[in-house]
Amino acid sequence: MKNSKQMKKWLDDLNLSHPLVIAGPCSAETEQQVLKIAIDLKETDVTIFRAGIWKPRTRPGMFEGVGAIGLKWLQKVKEHTGLLTAVEVANSSHVKLAIEHGIDVLWIGARSTVSPFIVQEIADSLQGTDKIVLVKNPVNPDLSLWLGGIERLYSANIKKLGVIHRGFSTYEKSKYRNNPEWQIAIELQSKFPDLPLICDPSHIAGRRDLIFNLSQRALDLNYDGLMIETHCDPDNAWSDAAQQVTPSSLVDIMKDLKIREMTIDKEEYKNQLDGFRQKIDNSDQLLLEILGKRMDVAEKIGLLKKSNNVAVLQNKRWNEILGKMIIDGESHGLSEEFILKIFKAIHQESINHQQNILNS
């Protein structure tokens, strides 16, 4: 699969003057609830109305969706508001029912993207259709798995594709329900710059008070749109109550978001930008040289350990380095999260170099 301008055609054809907005409840609960939310969203920036019909819950016994009857409610949404409709599908049966009920957009959830078998089943059942299909990132932070899901759909001749960044599950402590791991989405964007990229701040945040800042950051990173869970009575929602906003709150969020220019033609701006970028390039080159020298020293330590039959990993020394770097990093305006990621990667590379020496 190669990047192509055609990837963005379905989005361009919507002819929007603002980022794409997909909104609606985490779960379709009743016909009245679904229609009320949709009508409240009719005169907003929302283009696609989403609702969970089948809910893949972590544990049995939790609300797992109303099922196929909810698709009839979405037909009424389209009839009353003109909004496009979207649901999550997790198997060929879901796809068949969604198509039969005229659903416009299908998305593959994070729990499904992790399974090549599920994605392939969905891809096979979509062959010959013209639906828009959006692929959420897998639960675990694995770009290859995310790309694999997209490629399976593309190979099934499904060309109206996009991706949804909803964050990743990790064991690390975080204020977010799912860590954004922005660099993974950015890497995907760099490989396929014309593949529509949508942020789901609701699932990243897990809390409605974090949604605005996440949405702004996504737009600052040139995302094409947002998927925000919206409910008429979020505190009493049957699922994910804490991360849903009211339609009026959604309007406020969209009103306050700033849409940045991709670039401008001012000569002074371009000259200053070129100067700053040159400084970054120089700094990056110095970083690589320093890291190379550090690995040279790590290899010498590896030789010393080998000659004295000493184990590679020295936890006490590693913890001392990490503690010192966190303190030093903060004095340079670097977050603890960033320092941990950088030095864990450096430490792992050092271990790899020393392990190669011990095994040689």
Question: How should each PLM-predicted stretch be described?
Answer:
Residues 50-68, 232-241, 301-312:
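Glycine-rich, proline-tolerant flexible connector loops at the mouths of alpha/beta enzymes
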Residues 14, 118-249, 256, 261-269:
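Catalytic alpha/beta core domains of metabolic enzymes, predominantly
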Residues 19-36, 60-65, 84-89, 109-110, ...:
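Active-site mouth loops of central-metabolism enzymes
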Residues 1-22, 76, 255, 265:
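N-terminal amphipathic alpha-helix/helix-capping segment at the start of soluble metabolic enzymes
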Residues 19-25, 47-51, 85-87, 106-108, ...:
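Hydrophobic faces of well-ordered beta-strands that scaffold small-molecule active sites
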Residues 262-360:
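Domain-level signature for soluble enzymes in the chorismate/prephenate branch of the shikimate pathway
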Residues 36-53, 101:
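Catalytic domains of carbohydrate-active enzymes, especially glycoside hydrolases
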Residues 66, 82-91, 95, 104-119, ...:
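Catalytic beta/alpha-barrel core
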